[in-house]
Each structure stands twice: as structure tokens, then as C-alpha cells.
Amino acid sequence: MKRLVLILLALASLQCAFAATVREVILRDSTDRLMIPVDRNTMLDLYDYYDAGQHVYAKTPNKEEVEIDSITDNYICISTSRISLIQAWLAKAGSDSIVVVSTTYETKPRMSIVRAYNAQSFDDITDKVFTPLTLDDFIAKGTTKAKRAELKEKIPGLYVVYSINASTGEILASHHTYECFPKEDYDAIKPYLVEKRYLVLKGKKYRLAR
């Protein structure tokens, strides 16, 4: 308990230093709840608290409370186990950083809806950041039209999730395409998927390793 109090006091002293790029984060244990504004750098200071088995909560742009799943040097992954799975990756703090929120529905095939937000204002910038990809982007060249039609019928919708730094184009996280498919369908589709995939970002191509 003493350690928890010291951590909370230290975090409270940090909030003024990072007031320009704040995030609303909830620290919660079995007996108490404290809401403090922090940014990404402060988030990294929560590592000890996280590793101690405590739960750290944040709020998504649509005000849903989610538990932070992991904290790394490059991004913070937050998720919640509800009917839908919401994941967000925070780019490094800055005026042109983005938050990418993916909502994955447990349908067959699983479907992810993606929205991108400015990390500071939370303005929706999805159309400015992403060029949508379709199943055609992932089917290998040389696949016959008949086979393409068969694959599209089997997988009627496909959303691919990427998190990028809007200023550098650095890819912070991604869902592999085939994770959107039921396993039995993927086994049939796998031979027809391209080995390398490309993310089209504002007219530029970024190759993603398989």
C-alpha cells in the first residue's frame, strides 16, 4: 500500500509537466480509483505499477473504458474483452500523432472497422490517413478470374488494420490479414495470398513483411 501511495504521488507531480499532451487515465485497484491526466511518456512510467499486477485503465475517443494490455517503447496497446474487441495504438506524442481504433466483430469472417483520430484533438482523420485495401490487394497475380470470384464470395468483406505514425509513416502495429478469416477458410485461401503486402498511405507504399 505504501508503494502504491508513493507511485500515485509521483504521477501527480508529473501531470503538470505533460499538460500539453494529456490523456485521461484511470489507475484502479480493489479499493480505490484515481483519475489523472498523463501523456505517452508518463504512461511508460506506469510500467512498475503494471508489472506489480495492478490494472491500468484508459479511455478511448468514444469514452469507452479499456484496460491497457501492454506498454512498450513505441506504442501502447489497449484492449477490452467485450462482444467486440477494441484495440488502439498510440503514436508518439506530437501534434500530428494519430490514434487508430479497431473494432473487431466476432462474425464469420471476423470483421474489423477502423477509424483514425488526431491524438490531440481526436478529430476523425480516417480518410486523410488511410487508403482502403480490398481482397484484390492480397490475391496473388495469376489467379484466375473464376478463382478470384470464388475467394471474394467466400470472404465478402475485409478490413485491414494498421497503426502508423502520421508524420514518418512508421508502422507501429498491424493485424495480419489472414487473422480475419476462420481457420477452415484460411487453409483454402492461403495458397492464393501474396507473400508480401503493401500499405498505401497517402500515395506511398510501405511493404509489410508476412
Regions found by a protein language model. Name each.
Residues 96-106, 169-176:
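Short beta-strand elements that form the blades of beta-propeller/WD-repeat-like
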Residues 20-92:
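Terminal domain-start segments
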Residues 59-61, 69-71, 108-110, 189-193:
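Short, solvent-exposed loop/turn segments at conserved positions within beta-propeller repeat blades
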Residues 98-130:
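Mid-length scaffold segments of soluble, non-membrane domains
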Residues 83-86, 99, 109-114, 155-159, ...:
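Short, surface-exposed coil-to-beta transition loops
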Residues 14-19:
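Sec/Tat signal peptide C-region and signal peptidase I cleavage site
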Residues 4-13:
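Sec-dependent N-terminal signal peptides
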Residues 125-203, 208-210:
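Short aromatic loop motif centered on NTY/YTY
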